[in-house]
Amino acid sequence: MPLAAALVSLCASAQVLAEACVVHTQAEHLDVQVCQQNVSIPQQLFHDGFCEPNLPGQKVSVQYVEQCPQGAFGVCSDAHVDNMPYRQDIHYYGVASDAAYLRPFCEQKSLGKWLIPGLR
């Protein structure tokens, strides 16, 4: 029985790490949706800080999900969080031409790897 309890505990802890949040922001002439997939951020910090942006003048909605939904035009994989030892995958939705400035930011500032879903 202790083995079964250990397996259940292991599965539960793996589910804790499989977390993401979809952040949708809207303002005049602005409609942005990203999904942040947690890689190494402590759970409480991820929920209280990373998924709760303070964007004055914008309508912000946050939805917690197990994994980021499909349909992103680009993903900044293993993005480094400024001044912290944490990593996350950032999925971008919406206007694919935004990749022109998101990709350089991802690779140069966030030290991540730019991925295009569906391409290998």
Residue ranges and their predicted role:
Residues E19-R120:
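Extracellular/cell-surface secretome signature
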Residues M1-A4:
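Bacterial N-terminal signal peptides that target proteins for export
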